[in-house]
Amino acid sequence: MPTARQALLDAAHRALDEGPWRTVRMVDVAAVAGVSRQTLYNEFGTKGGLAGALLRRAADGYLAGVDRALTAPAPDRPAAVALWTVRAARQDALVKALLTGCWAEGLPRPEHRPGPRGRTAGRPPPTPEELVALVRERMVAVSPGAAAGRCEIALRLALSCVIVPVPGDDAADSRALGLVREGARVAVPAGLSGPSRTAGGRSPR
């Protein structure tokens, strides 16, 4: 059985699927979740706090998918992460916005203003640079040496597909995945080292 917090986040996400964030009302979110409005405010403090928690959950879910992709056989890991990145961004506009920093009309945005905070307000959602760095760190940790370079290239190519999506369904994703594999292989031939440490904090371009 979901906790009150999980139920509230689920209700908020459903409300976002049905209309722009600016029209989402806290009282309606609480009603759909089956909890009191006071419980909602205790958890998140403000509507901005709810938005931040929704964004953090989207980021955490995306990173959990990255971890699953990295359980693939070593040669397939860069492509598996790339495919997950493209699909996750296509399926969830919040993930796409978190990865690219491009916030479509109607999406909640991170807020950094001081104000009331719920008892579990927690950390702010990651910036695109921070989120990509977390993915890169995970990829490099399980792919030492030249494979780290292929991970870097695969991630950059995947983000390019997120910014300019390939039209179509899973078949189109598979074609894009083939391009990612080939691009990573050509860009970082066997025997070359991984990306420079000094480049670790830079966002893909």
Label each region the model flagged.
Residues 11-18, 61-69, 156-165:
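Solvent-exposed, amphipathic alpha-helical segments
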Residues 33-44:
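Short hydrophobic/aromatic patch on the recognition helix
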Residues 79-205:
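An extended, acidic
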Residues 56-80:
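Amphipathic alpha-helical linker/stalk segments
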